[in-house]
């Protein structure tokens, strides 16, 4: 929430150029409506060095962790439907498998040095 008085507004930043803007907006809207419906109080505004803070909730650190979180999300299934969630799960699992198959230049250099 930014501004004050007549200039008070809610800012929603796009998550990234690779995100579907319609899906991102739909999920953001669903989250806001869920917060209103369930009277969820937002946390206090954070002040300080977010990188040094140890007690903040964390987002997944890898695609595998993100897939596991998505698999468990009943909220998102309710918000956008099982079919959409399953489609994205299939896509992300395929993406992870393809990533796992790649041998990086670091691996080549590191392990050819040892042989």
Predicted regions and their residues:
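Catalytic-core signal marking the mid-to-C-terminal active-site face
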Residues: 1-115
């Amino acid at each position: 929430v930014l501004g004050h008085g007549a200039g008070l507004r809610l800012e929603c930043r796009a998550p990234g150029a690779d995100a579907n803007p319609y899906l991102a907006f739909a999920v953001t809207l669903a989250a806001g409506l869920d917060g209103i419906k369930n009277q969820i109080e937002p946390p206090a505004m954070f002040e300080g060095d977010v990188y040094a803070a140890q007690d903040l909730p964390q987002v997944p650190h890898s695609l595998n962790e993100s897939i596991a979180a998505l698999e468990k999300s009943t909220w998102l299934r309710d918000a956008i439907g099982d079919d959409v969630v399953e489609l994205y799960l299939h896509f992300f699992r395929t993406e992870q498998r393809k990533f796992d198959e790649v041998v990086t230049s670091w691996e080549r250099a590191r392990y050819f040095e040892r042989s």
